[in-house]
Amino acid sequence: MNKIVKTFQVAVFLTLGFIVTGYYLLSALNIILFLFLRDFVTISLSTDSMHGSKNPEKWDIRNLVKIGISVGAIQVVEMLILFFVGIRYLDLGNNIGVMNTFFHGDNFFFGLLTPIIVRENYFFWKSAPGRTLMVSIIGDMVVVSILSLFGFGMVAPVTLIDFVFILSYGLFMNLLVNDVFKVLLKKVGLSR
């Protein structure tokens, strides 16, 4: 389901961002960094500490896709809200490099937190992620944080205030709003 959510969210958000601004919200380097760093988390999912059921799992692929697209759609709306705030109040429209870094951080934090919420049928805190998964997520967050704040000639740095806003927004939206939304989808009959 993680793959469905991310593919939908990234494709739709970047397409809408380009249509609205005429600019790519992520540079080619941002996309390469995103894919490279996110792979560590994707690979570490195989070592997660989730316990399987006593009986063989029977997945309803149609429902998995519906849930994935629903969570992806709410993430697109949340990212569009952040886009509006960034352009309107944080003055990101004047510097393409800073805008790229801002949305790279946004996209990245949403991408890192999605496995945390979709790995569990109920609220994400019902079971702790495996050590390798958490180390991968935290390690990636540290790398992206350092790159976003300092740039090192690779990307345009964002301000500390902008960065804290991106991180706080991503944590709140994913670990609270999106997780509750996922549980509500289950309550209305959409489950794996």
Locations of regions flagged by a protein language model:
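C-terminal transmembrane module of polytopic membrane proteins
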Residues: 87, 100-192
